[in-house]
Amino acid sequence: MRTFQEIILALQHYWTRQGCALLQPYDMEVGAGTSHTATFLRALGPEPWKAAYVQPTRRPKDGRYGENPNRLQHYYQFQAVLKPAPSDILELYLGSLEELGFDLRQNDIRFVEDDWENPTLGAWGLGWEVWLNGMEVTQFTYFQQVGGMNCKPITGEITYGLERLAMYLQGVDNVFDLTWTKGLSYRDVYHQNEVEQSFYNFGHSDLDFLFQAFASHEAQARHLVEQGLPLPAYEQVLKAAHTFNLLDARGAISVTERAAYIGRIRELARSVAHAYYESRKRLGFPLAPVEWTQELLEKAA
């Protein structure tokens, strides 16, 4: 039986062998692994990119005080990002399942069409959910747009739900019963955090502070974009997005206001995406093959 940390190590070794740079989690609250700069920003422009990383993910509304066996406000995703998306990306994914110990002939693996969209980040793509014996464990996406900008070449993203994969591999029905490593369970590591963070998310966050924080992060992001600093600006966008999610968890935002807030974050994300693209362009897209860069600049002329 693979422990939770052994599953992570196996995926890291597998994607490293496929030529991916093994990166570390982004050190801020994000609602999905896609929000890591290694995906959101690196999907822009002509520069090739191959990376893999674990990303802790926070979704305040999904907290259940540690009482739900498979729903958490904090959990883990594993991301593999391949740009341009290789023609054999599905085969590479199936190879990763074999690496984890799945017998592809003995398990029901289905690719269910499910195009992906993140309205907050102005991103969308064509894709599939991967169902393993009736449970969704992975999302495939071919990015079409990020920050409202067309992606060329197309980036392929594979997002694994680590807890779900581990629950199947370990044969448990409760996420807290997962073996993290010998002598240590997922409950030992994270149950108290789920309980306390749920109380914070749903009852003890300071609404006045959060509304003020959102406005401050929004203003700071705009200022940083104007100063030509897209990376710090993007961090402010992520802070604004997490603050919005906390307000949403408290029910402090009406349906009408919710759409308006999402629109404000999306506009920030778009401005950051454009600023980042221009910053790489000024550098001459240093990671791109010369012929790609020349073709792009000629079309823009």
Swiss-Prot record:
<comment type="similarity">
    <text>Belongs to the class-II aminoacyl-tRNA synthetase family.</text>
</comment>
<dbReference type="InterPro" id="IPR006194">
    <property type="entry name" value="Gly-tRNA-synth_heterodimer"/>
</dbReference>
<dbReference type="GO" id="GO:0004820">
    <property type="term" value="F:glycine-tRNA ligase activity"/>
</dbReference>
<dbReference type="Pfam" id="PF02091">
    <property type="entry name" value="tRNA-synt_2e"/>
</dbReference>
<dbReference type="InterPro" id="IPR045864">
    <property type="entry name" value="aa-tRNA-synth_II/BPL/LPL"/>
</dbReference>
<keyword id="KW-0030">Aminoacyl-tRNA synthetase</keyword>
<keyword id="KW-0963">Cytoplasm</keyword>
<keyword id="KW-0547">Nucleotide-binding</keyword>
<comment type="subunit">
    <text>Tetramer of two alpha and two beta subunits.</text>
</comment>
<dbReference type="GO" id="GO:0005829">
    <property type="term" value="C:cytosol"/>
</dbReference>
<keyword id="KW-0648">Protein biosynthesis</keyword>
<dbReference type="GO" id="GO:0006426">
    <property type="term" value="P:glycyl-tRNA aminoacylation"/>
</dbReference>
<dbReference type="InterPro" id="IPR002310">
    <property type="entry name" value="Gly-tRNA_ligase_asu"/>
</dbReference>
<protein>
    <recommendedName>
        <fullName>Glycine--tRNA ligase alpha subunit</fullName>
        <ecNumber>6.1.1.14</ecNumber>
    </recommendedName>
</protein>
<dbReference type="GO" id="GO:0005524">
    <property type="term" value="F:ATP binding"/>
</dbReference>
<keyword id="KW-0436">Ligase</keyword>
<keyword id="KW-0067">ATP-binding</keyword>
